[in-house]
Design a protein with these regions (language model features):
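Conserved phosphate-donor/acceptor-positioning beta-strand/loop module used by diverse small-molecule
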Residues: 116-139, 143-152
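Glycine-rich phosphate-binding P-loop
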Residues: 6-24
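Small-molecule kinase domains that catalyze NTP-dependent phosphoryl transfer to phosphate-bearing small molecules
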Residues: 61-66, 143-188
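Short beta-strand-centered segment that lines the nucleotide-binding/catalytic pocket of NTP-utilizing
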Residues: 30-42
Length: 199
């Protein structure tokens, strides 16, 4: 294999999750997304829903980011907020799952967790509004107003979480090795491109 790991960050409605799942299936490797949260939930004996609430509570402030990173480097977890502890637990879970072999990782700043590993390709998937609206409508069967609300909510959540924990912009294409427009390439087209990196 040319690369062992693919980390995928994606815009809500771009089909990124579906692309990751199909890629993993075709390459016969695991795809970790919600599983990362489940690992943390088991460790702390809390629900996945609670973890998601902690993620939503993350601020994108510079001071928060510096604080979390300094505590992580010193190994001092006592002063960390619940949000900071969850982030570090997710990073540890990703690193642990990577030890099992080749995999696709969805979101959760996986590229940051695996930055010291070789064979990692960082991917960002985006699409035009029309494509995203169509996919969201098909997946959720909701009104256009609700659809736009959800799209903005989830993209903002992902951007804040990424920024707060990496000090980088989630949608800055310079943070990725490959950027794919699923609206132009299609779901299968994106899978084909990524598969060529693995086999």
């Amino acid at each position: 294999m040319k690369y062992q790991y693919i980390t995928i960050e994606r815009e809500f409605g771009s089909g990124g999750t579906r692309i990751g799942e199909l890629l993993a299936k075709e390459c016969k490797m695991p795809c970790y997304g919600r599983e990362i949260l489940e690992c943390v939930a088991r460790k702390y004996d809390i629900s996945v829903e609670q973890i998601e609430q902690y993620e939503e509570g993350v601020t994108n402030s510079f001071l928060y980011t510096v604080f979390v990173m300094s505590k992580a480097q010193s190994g001092d977890m006592n002063m960390l907020s619940d949000e900071g502890k969850v982030y570090l637990a997710e990073q540890a879970a990703i690193q642990s799952l990577a030890q099992n072999g080749s995999a696709v990782f969805m979101g959760h700043c996986a590229s940051e967790a695996l930055k010291d590993r070789k064979g990692v390709v960082k991917v960002f998937i985006h699409a035009n509004d029309a494509f995203k609206q169509k996919r969201i409508q098909e997946d959720y069967q909701i009104s256009p107003n609700r659809m736009e609300f959800l799209r903005k909510k989830y993209d903002k959540k992902r951007a804040n979480y990424y920024r707060a924990n990496t000090m980088k912009r989630w949608d800055d294409y310079r943070n990725y090795d490959i950027v794919l427009n699923s609206g132009e390439l299609g779901i299968e087209g994106c899978v084909k491109v990524l598969k060529s990196l693995l086999v």
